[in-house]
Amino acid sequence: MTILHTQINTRSPEFAANQAAMTALVDDLHTLLARVRQGGGAKAQERHTSRGKLLPRNRINCLLDPGSAFLEIGQLAAHEVYGEDVPAAGAVAGIGRVEGVECMILANDATVKGGSYYPLTVKKHLRAQTIARENRLPCIYLVDSGGGNLPRQDEVFPDREHFGHIFFNQANMSAMGIPQIAVVMGSCTAGGAYVPAMADESIMVRNQATIFLAGPPQTRSDVGVQIRAGFSGRLFLVSKEARNHFGRVFPAIRRREVKQQA
């Protein structure tokens, strides 16, 4: 075996200076990633958990096989892009093992702008789907999203790979035999409602999950009718028309769905 010799002097002042500079950069990166993992911040997380809901990374940890790794992608997506904090573009995405099967998992972070989709959230979601398609990874969507970010809705559609391409990908991967599984974790409005609607299997968490294109506020403003979220989009109503499973609590949700379909 050929030995490659180095001429770097690890005791030189130049090496020490470079090492110190790199260590500082790595420390800065770790600090930034730790801040990103806080999502929308302590107040938003407290409000989220007070409703009996898990944070997105905790949801993923409950789903993964015990002790298995999670390869996260796009942690710094949307960092310092919009003039406001949108940590990880409001979604956590990565590859993890569920029931022994490598899966692409994407979880909306409702603590970040209600889990709404900014332009780079769309790009991140599409990138995750591309990786899944190229490697034939089952997709698990942990949905808790208000759909397209309204102040930027003009930016999430005018593109060849726009917001609607997410659902195009779901349909095509389903046709390819790549399982598309959605777990509805909260209120899924407008664009957020299409992900479970287009999935092969949808699981809805009892007393938390709702799906509607236009929720109670819009119904009230558009037609003057006041209705409850449970009436317009709660799981008992949706389940009459779609294949949905009732999940009482998320950690107990049917992980075997992945194994059955993969």
Regions found by a protein language model. Give the residues of each.
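N-terminal cationic and glycine-rich segments that engage phosphates or anionic surfaces
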Residues: 219
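N-terminal low-complexity segments that are often proline-rich with Ser/Thr-Pro
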Residues: 222-262
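Terminal-region recognition feature
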Residues: 1-187, 191-194, 198-214, 228, ...
